[in-house]
Amino acid sequence: MNEFNSVFRDEIKIHLSVREAELSHEAYRHYRRTVILFDDYLCKIQHTDKEIPESVVESWIKEVSVGISLNTSSQYIHHVRQLLLFLVNSGYKCFLPRTLITHDTYVPYLYSDEDIEKIFEVADSLVVTRAAKNKYVEKEMPLLLRLLYCCGLRVGETVSIKVGDLDFDRDLIILRVTKKYKQRLVPFGKDLAEILYRYCVGMGILNDSEAYLFPGEDTHSHISANNVGNYYRIIRKKAGIDSHCQIKNGRGACLHCFRHTFAVRSFDKNERNGIKASESVPFLSTYLGHDS
């Protein structure tokens, strides 16, 4: 029996294949569950039109929100909005619900200079002892972590980079697979440019524009975000960094915290250069791929 049976089942499968590469295993599990609920609802009301009006979305939100917290309801709405945004960008007419505003108490972990030094030291000497399908892990993890830290990228965006997305003439990365489905340019410094170039030469992929920068089983498939997370947990543990945050509502050290650390350090650097945080926000938001 097919898991998705609505009129948008084919589009949903394509969308989920992208989201699986972008999200952690746990985040993807929750996201997929929401999509299944929405697909089931479309089947339940016998919706056969290749468009989704406001009435359908609002009715689903009303039904799915019964007996759950405001935060959970907000998460459902956010998830289905991402699916609908994908459908809109695919040429379908769909209503986009507004995400509920809830009180955000999340406290991110910020890596210290000492943390970063330990992480890179362990990553640079990583040895995968057990048999692994991905023979490139020991080479790709050191660079992948440096990109997360130095450029503030999302994990899903990073693993989707192809060699052809690197512009060594302008020292830019062209991000094509992004959370908001909007292509954007990310600059990198001269030191990272040299590391990237030498890495591509060493991997034998410099002249293959379709090769993934971080291969999976071969250069024309990429390592999954889940596997990156698994290998990072090994590195983090060897580096002696506690994954359990002692602060209330804290997340603890994780891959996404490289992005938070990048943002905070960018604000600090700008303030030292006389640029107020309020003036930095629009530029940093655009750089990070946020709507605002």
Feature map (PLM): residue ranges:
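Conserved catalytic core of the tyrosine transesterase superfamily
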Residues: M1-S292
